[in-house]
């Protein structure tokens, strides 16, 4: 028996349908270097601010330089990730289109199968109705023959 598609088949959730927190997790998994770079840059800014408040100019300058370097590295990771992810997204889109076409074909096959089964059921109903009519005709003929037999027996016994 062929596998028919089910209304319970669940596909991967679309990115637009995800909640805000789920979107953040999704994008962090797609480009893991960007959040790491962002956290390191934030840490460098916080350390620079602490040293500025203390009055330590050398460490403040050191952490601000690290901030610039980490920000540049984060930006490079973002661009590289976008380039790589862009190719993956194109391939994924192509694959999704193929899956949609396959799903449409599967749905059409499913509809044809249901129509075929419906036609078979209709044929069985017609055959059953014809058999019922034939049975009624035969019963009427049997009753007629029985009646004739009784009449003949009645004549024969007289």
From Swiss-Prot:
Transmembrane segments: 32-54, 64-86
Entry's localization field: Mitochondrion membrane
Membrane topology annotation: Multi-pass membrane protein
Keyword set, alphabetical order: Coiled coil, Membrane, Mitochondrion, Transmembrane, Transmembrane helix
Pfam families named in the record: HIG_1_N
Stretch forming the signal peptide: none
Keyword Acetylation: no
Recorded GO CC terms: mitochondrial inner membrane; respiratory chain complex
Coiled-coil region(s): 99-158
HIG1 domain residues: 5-96
One GO BP annotation of this record: regulation of proton transport
Xref: InterPro entries: Hypoxia_induced_domain, RCF1
Functional note: Cytochrome c oxidase subunit which plays a role in assembly of respiratory supercomplexes.
SUBUNIT field: Associates with the respiratory chain complex III/complex IV supercomplex.
Membership in a protein family: Belongs to the RCF1 family.
Record-given protein name: Respiratory supercomplex factor 1, mitochondrial
Highest classification ranks of the organism: Eukaryota, Fungi, Dikarya, Ascomycota, Saccharomycotina
């Amino acid at each position: 028996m062929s596998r028919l598609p089910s209304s319970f088949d669940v596909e991967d959730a679309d990115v637009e349908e995800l909640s805000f927190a789920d979107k953040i997790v999704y994008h962090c998994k797609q480009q893991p270097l960007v959040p790491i770079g962002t956290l390191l840059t934030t840490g460098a800014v916080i350390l620079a601010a602490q040293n500025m408040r203390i009055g330590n100019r050398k460490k403040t300058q050191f952490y601000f330089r690290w901030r610039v370097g980490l920000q540049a590295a984060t930006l490079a990771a973002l661009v590289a990730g976008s380039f790589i992810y862009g190719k993956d997204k194109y391939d994924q889109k192509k694959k999704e289109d193929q899956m949609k076409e396959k799903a449409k074909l599967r749905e059409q096959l499913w509809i044809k199968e249901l129509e075929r089964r419906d036609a078979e059921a209709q044929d069985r109903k017609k055959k059953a109705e014809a058999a019922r009519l034939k049975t009624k005709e035969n019963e009427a003929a049997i009753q007629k023959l029985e009646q004739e037999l009784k009449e003949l027996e009645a004549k024969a016994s007289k």
